[in-house]
Amino acid sequence: MKADTLYQIDREIHEGFNLTMMKPFNLEAAHIYGVEVFPGERPMMIPVAEHPDIYTMLDSSSVAEDISPYSMFAIVTTGWAAPLEDVTDIEDGLPPSQHPKRRRVRVLMLVDQETDQIMSSLRFGDSDDVIYNEEREGAGSLMDAVESLMRTAKKHKRGRNFND
């Protein structure tokens, strides 16, 4: 997967949300899309699922089965972000939502099921800043859940090919 694919899908999601939602940085549910990219064309993004709890959605076997035919999938969710400049905040367990410098953030994770590559973008509600992570840098419960979903989707894909 190329970084250009991430940029293009991030832009499509951003523009679409801005056109259709009053609060594109306060989503009521996390969203997942099946994604296909064809040379010279806009990416095809098919809504697959949404759920108010991202972890419930990512743990769903039916969602894994629904995304298995696609070469990629994208996850979009919103929440709070806080600067990591003060290590004591992290050590004290201060959640980003309570940090005095908190910001609304929308995260897009793009997963290539053929190469196991995961890229992400972060957009902030109070600026035009975009941070692109072209390497698999994430860690923690969200990354673990995304990797688990990818593994389960691959099992569904193998099972379907075996039965064809």
Can you say where each PLM-predicted feature lies in the sequence?
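Short loop/turn segments at secondary-structure transitions that flank enzyme active sites
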Residues: 38-40, 81, 114-117
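Glycine-rich, aromatic-bearing surface loops/beta-hairpins
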Residues: 97-164
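N-terminal domain-onset segments
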Residues: 1-63
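Short HxH-centered metal-ligating active-site micro-motif
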Residues: 57-94
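Short, surface-exposed beta-edge/turn micro-motifs
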Residues: 28-33, 70-72, 94, 103-107
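Short linear motifs in intrinsically disordered
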Residues: 21-25, 94-101
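Short glycine-rich, low-complexity/disordered patches
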Residues: 25-36, 72-77, 159-164
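Short acidic, S/G/P-rich loop/turn micro-motifs used as interaction or catalytic elements
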Residues: 53, 80-83, 130, 137-138
